[in-house]
């Protein structure tokens, strides 16, 4: 809530049928939050779409519950989007709980060739190669702003007018892959996705969601 102190924001929490008292806790401690309590697990895409459809802001920020942001993260992201009219989506530098950089902060489009290089370890062997390192764009400086192909669903800011053109998250993706699909549609609509490392977030479950399985790739 502190991160929204200087931002005109509406906050939605979508609960996918949790059983740990989260719904009641949010209602009690954060009465200003608009909560959607689902009776079953709708999946990532559908749950986020529920909130997006109710949102009224110029920008939409999708943010996982296992993240921690800096107090000025949202301000910096909004300033960047305001200054770059070509930006359809924006992602930030993500680190895990130990402070380690999460490579999924910036990704290329996982074409069959790019996915092959990742699955067979070539991207790890040659991270600085523009040929083999495209999956995580590992040849790009992690401390500089870059145009990228794919935003991470854990934290992605999207211009609302762009969503009007691309459509919302594809609900045929229950979990994983929906961020790739939407990122691709953003670029196909003529906008750019940017990696913005001038602020960072902690993503505690980043290591468990590296999505390195063959099914995901």
Where would I find each of the regions flagged by the language model?
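Glycine-rich, basic loop-to-helix element that forms the pyrophosphate-binding segment
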Residues: 37-55, 76
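Short aromatic/hydrophobic "clamp" motif used to bind/position activated sugar donors
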Residues: 60
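Conserved donor NDP-sugar-binding/catalytic core segment of glycosyltransferases
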Residues: 71-105
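Short, flexible, basic/aromatic active-site loop/helix in glycosyltransferases
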Residues: 109-148
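Active-site-adjacent helix/loop segment of glycosyltransferases
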Residues: 95, 184-217
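A conserved acidic beta->alpha catalytic loop
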Residues: 7, 15-24, 40
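A short, conserved alpha-helix in the catalytic core of glycosyltransferases
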Residues: 141-200
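Short, acidic, metal-binding catalytic loop of nucleotide-sugar glycosyltransferases
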Residues: 1-8
């Amino acid at each position: 809530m502190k991160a929204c102190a200087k931002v005109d924001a509406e906050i939605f929490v979508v609960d996918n049928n949790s059983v740990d008292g989260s719904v009641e806790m949010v209602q009690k401690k954060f009465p200003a939050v608009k909560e959607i309590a689902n009776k079953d697990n709708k999946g990532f895409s559908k749950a986020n779409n529920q909130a997006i459809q109710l949102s009224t802001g110029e920008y939409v920020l999708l943010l996982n519950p296992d993240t921690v942001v800096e107090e000025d993260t949202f301000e910096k992201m909004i300033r960047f989007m305001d200054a770059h009219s070509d930006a359809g989506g924006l992602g930030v530098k993500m680190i895990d709980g130990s402070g380690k950089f999460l490579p999924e902060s910036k990704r290329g489009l996982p074409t069959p060739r790019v996915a092959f290089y990742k699955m067979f370890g070539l991207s790890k062997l040659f991270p600085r190669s523009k040929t083999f390192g495209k999956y995580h764009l590992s040849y790009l400086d992690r401390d500089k702003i870059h145009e990228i192909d794919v935003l991470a669903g854990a934290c992605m800011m999207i211009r609302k007018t762009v969503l009007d053109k691309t459509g919302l998250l594809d609900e045929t993706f229950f979990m994983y892959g929906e961020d790739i699909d939407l990122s691709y549609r953003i670029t196909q609509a003529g906008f750019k996705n940017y990696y913005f490392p001038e602020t960072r977030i902690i993503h505690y479950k980043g290591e468990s969601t590296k999505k390195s399985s063959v099914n995901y790739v």
